[in-house]
């Protein structure tokens, strides 16, 4: 049988793309049975065949009431129906059995490998919110799997450590390379569950009342992971349920609809809405990640030129024979119905894109490919969804399986014995724990005691590489750069929007400013609250390496000799504890089909061989250094920093508990307009800039009412004012959020042409005029640069504070 190597790809979310180091190896599938019901065989990567589908005689599916609340497909992915139920339908006898009578609502069924049980999401009649449950296929053996404050949905099974059934021994050594292997008990090899969850009280970047991310669920109280890594899974524990969950993705908007790929990865949809991303509308991309969150990488929908634009992309699954990614393409990002579209799994580019439906005038949802090349779908011609076999030759719904006119029938889950794909090894045991392993065996548990947060490390081979043009948008290059032009990187953490006091928070408070409807009382722009994890220097060849917080959403900016962002990554990235990430440059696009030059980067050499870097890698620095003219002179730590120079792989652990920059949340910086910028304007600018000499920077921190809402000061309203006829995503009259280098305010403060994108004509019109570059100190000027590059927010301090802000009167 032929083998196909999909490539060794190295990458990370940078300038809208995420590419990560991973070797994905697959074999061509060998199918028998054809398009009719029968037996299909799958040849895995090592040439061993297993039966993946016998006769399909039963189908689980969801029935939802035909009301907006009963089937809220226009509120996707926050799909929490009322009164839905899961039923078992026998294709031979045509009998229908309701399995979830004890639930107020139940949906999202997914069958186990042997077809004898299934996982689902549901709200029990006894209460407790929307949780993950498990039940035998006959309706017996109900087991609750989560007890999370929030919403859990879309469970799928993952066969980690459970390719063979039965019990497995937990064997590991105490720490490092010391001692003998010891047995620490037995555990049933039931594998893991991956699901999508939204904690209670969070909002996404559109201020919707949810923000989903993917979690992995240890069905044996953390011991499945213990058998693999040597440490019990650390995360959110439910001892009364004997389960533990660990968040594996970090996105300020939503990651949802997980599905298993043939090579053991997790396929899912990801809403990317960082600030001005995709014209401020955001974009839904199809993404793939390891089951522990180690290597997220984009597949399709991440690029400006990809077909479908800002449409919704959900419920993606991979067909077996021709290996297509089939998904629901919706006219709106928050719709869960639409038309079926597809791209090749092996070459997910525009040339392989195809629209599978659209000529019959109906709506589709819930595609489910089978190994014998058939596919179940849910289809509605006039609002009544039923279950059908899809007719590929006619690009339309074919033979009807079941359609009850009183219910919307959807989410089919055929019952059959499934093949367990090769599972990918994990190097993290959850929050704050990383491990080093030899394939499928626990080897060395690593945790640095005393430090307040675990970290990960990433390296970029060349920060000057980019496929983006020079342009005024933050994700584009502000100017052309070569080796030596990029001096440092700024690492920015996004803060999840959590505002429990509705009297102190107002969505759309800055509708009159650049942020429009995506603004809030925290920000007059589309950029939510965020802080600076730190800075790291860039080598002369454009490479850089750094360590920083793990398990937080972040993105990067590359900085020139003035410390200004030349290009901003507008896709959220994340590191898992003690993992590494390799970045190849600033680009968009799918990681599949990319090939990267193997170069000897200085940062890589210094990381491994320089004595100054033997402690894992340089941690992010708190500040940049400049001369009096504003020229970059290096990075610097704060006065009270502790650098863990005696911590290195295989060495002593827990040497200090002092704050460490890049690791300690208390050591993180942010720039808050009220605290940091308004005092500069009051002291240096307001005496000249008033209503007769705009921008009007007077009035201090007194809130000014606009359209009946008093959320910001007069100075903030003036600086964030839009410019007629100008796209607000490239700024207004004075400020371009996330691109200080393209902002009129900064050009005047530095009295220099800073980029290839002049904010307006005749910026320096009069010779002998008053020069602004002498009024502010370099620290004051750079504080304004940082404020704009972060997104020009009003309130960048999460939680309550004593500075002025919006208040319902």
UniProtKB/Swiss-Prot annotation:
Q: Which GO terms describe its molecular function?
A: metal ion binding; oxidoreductase activity
Task: Report residues binding heme 1.
Answer: 583, 586, 591
- Keyword Metal-binding in the entry? The reply is yes
Q: Where in the cell is it found?
A: Anammoxosome
Task: Please give the pathway this protein is involved in.
Answer: Nitrogen metabolism
Q: In this protein, which residues make up the domain named Cytochrome c?
A: 633-792
Q: What is its main location?
A: other
Which SUPFAM superfamilies does this chain map to? Answer: Tricorn protease N-terminal domain (SSF69304)
Name the positions where heme 2 binds: 685, 688-689, 772
Kindly state what the record says about how the cofactor is bound.
Binds two heme c groups per subunit.
Q: What is its EC number?
A: 1.7.2.7
Q: Name one GO cellular component term.
A: anammoxosome
Signal peptide from the UniProt entry: 1-27
Q: What is expression of this protein induced or repressed by?
A: Is among the most highly expressed proteins in the proteome.
For the protein in the UniProt heading, the enzyme class is oxidoreductase
Keywords for this entry?
Answer: Heme, Iron, Metal-binding, Oxidoreductase, Signal, Zinc
Q: What does this protein do?
A: Component of the hydrazine synthase complex that catalyzes the condensation of nitric oxide (NO) with ammonium to form hydrazine. The alpha subunit catalyzes the second half-reaction, i.e. the condensation of hydroxylamine formed in the active site of the gamma subunit with ammonia, yielding hydrazine.
Let me see what the UniProt entry remarks about domains: The alpha subunit consists of three domains: an N-terminal domain which includes a six-bladed beta-propeller, a middle domain binding a pentacoordinated c-type heme and a C-terminal domain which harbors a bis-histidine-coordinated c-type heme.
Could you identify this protein by its name?
Hydrazine synthase subunit alpha
Native source organism of the sequence: Kuenenia stuttgartiensis
**Source taxonomy lineage?**
Bacteria, Pseudomonadati, Planctomycetota, Candidatus Brocadiia, Candidatus Brocadiales
């Amino acid at each position: 049988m032929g083998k196909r190597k999909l490539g060794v790809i190295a990458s990370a979310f940078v300038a809208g793309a995420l590419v990560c180091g991973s070797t994905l190896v697959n074999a061509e599938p060998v199918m028998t049975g054809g398009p009719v019901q029968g037996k299909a065989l799958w040849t895995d990567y090592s040439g061993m065949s297993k039966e993946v589908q016998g006769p399909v005689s039963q189908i689980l599916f969801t029935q939802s009431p035909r009301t907006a609340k009963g089937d809220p497909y226009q509120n996707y992915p926050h799909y929490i129906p009322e009164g839905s139920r899961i039923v078992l339908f026998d294709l031979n006898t045509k009998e229908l059995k309701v399995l979830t009578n004890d639930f107020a609502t139940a949906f999202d069924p997914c069958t186990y490998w042997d077809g004898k049980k299934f996982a689902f999401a549901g709200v029990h009649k006894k209460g407790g919110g929307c949780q993950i449950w498990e039940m035998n296929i006959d309706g017996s053996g109900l087991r609750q799997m989560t007890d999370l404050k929030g919403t859990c949905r879309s469970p799928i099974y993952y066969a980690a450590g459970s390719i063979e059934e039965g019990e497995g021994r937990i064997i590991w050594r105490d720490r490092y390379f010391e001692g003998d292997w010891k047995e620490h008990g037995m555990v049933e090899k039931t594998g893991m569950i991956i699901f999508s969850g939204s904690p209670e009280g969070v909002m996404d970047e559109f201020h919707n009342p949810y923000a989903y991310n993917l979690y992995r669920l240890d069905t044996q109280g953390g011991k499945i992971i213990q058998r693999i890594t040597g440490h019990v899974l650390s995360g959110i524990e439910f001892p009364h349920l004997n389960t533990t969950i660990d968040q594996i993705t970090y996105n300020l908007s939503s990651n949802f609809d997980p599905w298993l790929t043939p090579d053991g990865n997790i396929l899912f949809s990801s809403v990317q809405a960082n600030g001005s991303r995709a014209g401020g509308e955001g974009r839904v991309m199809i993404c793939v990640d390891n089951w522990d969150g180690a290597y997220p990488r984009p597949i399709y929908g991440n690029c400006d030129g990809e077909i479908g634009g800002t449409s919704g992309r959900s419920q993606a699954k991979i067909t077996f024979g021709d290996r297509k990614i089939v998904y629901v393409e919706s006219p709106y990002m928050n719709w869960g119905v639409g038309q079926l579209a597809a791209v090749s799994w092996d070459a997910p580019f525009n040339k392989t894109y195809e629209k599978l439906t659209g000529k019959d005038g109906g709506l589709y949802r819930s595609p489910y490919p089978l190994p014998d090349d058939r596919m179940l779908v849910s289809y509605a011609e006039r609002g009544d969804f039923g279950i059908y076999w899809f007719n590929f030759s006619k690009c339309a719904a074919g033979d009807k399986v079941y359609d009850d006119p009183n219910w919307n029938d959807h989410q089919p889950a055929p019952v059959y014995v499934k093949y367990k794909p090769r599972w990918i090894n994990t190097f993290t045991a959850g929050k704050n724990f990383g491990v080093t392993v030899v394939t499928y065996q626990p080897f060395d548990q690593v945790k640095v005691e005393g430090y307040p947060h675990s970290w990960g490390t990433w390296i970029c081979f060349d920060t000057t590489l980019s496929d983006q043009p020079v342009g005024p948008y933050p994700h584009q290059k502000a100017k052309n750069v070569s080796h030596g032009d990029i001096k440092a990187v700024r690492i920015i953490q996004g803060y999840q929007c959590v505002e429990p006091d509705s009297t102190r928070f107002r969505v759309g408070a800055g509708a009159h400013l650049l942020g429009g409807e995506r603004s809030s009382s925290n920000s007059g722009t589309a950029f939510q609250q965020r802080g600076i994890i730190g800075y790291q220097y860039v080598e002369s060849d454009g490479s850089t390496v750094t360590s920083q917080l793990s398990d937080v959403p972040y993105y990067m900016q590359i900085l020139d000799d003035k410390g200004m962002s030349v290009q901003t990554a507008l896709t959220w990235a994340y590191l898992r504890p003690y993992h590494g990430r390799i970045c190849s440059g600033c680009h968009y696009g799918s990681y599949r089909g990319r090939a990267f030059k193997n170069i000897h980067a200085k940062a890589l050499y210094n990381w491994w061989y320089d004595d100054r870097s033997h402690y894992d890698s340089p941690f992010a620095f708190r500040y940049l250094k400049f001369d009096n003219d504003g020229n970059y002179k290096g990075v610097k730590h704060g006065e009270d920093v502790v650098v863990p120079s005696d911590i290195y792989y295989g060495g002593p652990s827990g040497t200090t508990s002092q704050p460490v920059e890049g690791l300690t949340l208390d050591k993180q910086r942010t720039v808050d307009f009220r605290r940091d910028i308004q005092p500069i304007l009051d002291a240096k600018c307001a005496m000249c800039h008033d209503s007769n000499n705009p921008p009007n920077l007077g009035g201090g921190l007194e809130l000014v009412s606009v359209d009946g809402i008093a959320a910001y000061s007069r100075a903030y309203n003036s600086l964030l004012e839009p410019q007629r006829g100008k796209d607000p995503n490239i700024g207004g009259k004075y400020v371009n959020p996330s691109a200080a280098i393209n902002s009129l305010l900064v050009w005047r403060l530095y009295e220099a042409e800073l980029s290839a994108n002049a904010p307006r004509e005749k910026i320096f019109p009069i010779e002998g005029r008053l020069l602004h570059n002498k009024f502010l100190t370099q620290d004051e000027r750079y504080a304004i640069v940082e404020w704009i590059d972060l997104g020009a927010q009003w309130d960048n301090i999460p939680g309550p504070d004593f500075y002025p802000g919006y208040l319902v009167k």
